[in-house]
């Protein structure tokens, strides 16, 4: 198997996990400072 392909497959889950953690943390902090934004948008 190609070495670059193995490096790609092993990097994407790590980057994805970091990105999802950052996104979840960002949404949690937005809701902490502005708790009514989600309910006002309905």
UniProtKB/Swiss-Prot annotation:
The chain crosses the membrane at residues 8-28. GO terms for biological process: photosynthesis. The keyword Transmembrane helix applies. It is a single-pass membrane protein. Keywords: Chloroplast, Membrane, Photosynthesis, Photosystem I, Plastid, Thylakoid, Transmembrane, Transmembrane helix. It is found in: Plastid, Chloroplast thylakoid membrane. It comes from the Eukaryota. Its main location: plastid. Belongs to the PsaJ family. May help in the organization of the PsaE and PsaF subunits. This is Photosystem I reaction center subunit IX. It comes from Gracilaria tenuistipitata var. liui (Red alga).
């Amino acid at each position: 198997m190609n070495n670059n392909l193995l490096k790609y497959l092993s990097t994407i889950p790590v980057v994805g996990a970091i990105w999802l953690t950052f996104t979840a943390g960002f949404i949690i902090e937005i809701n902490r400072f502005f708790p009514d934004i989600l309910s006002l948008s309905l």
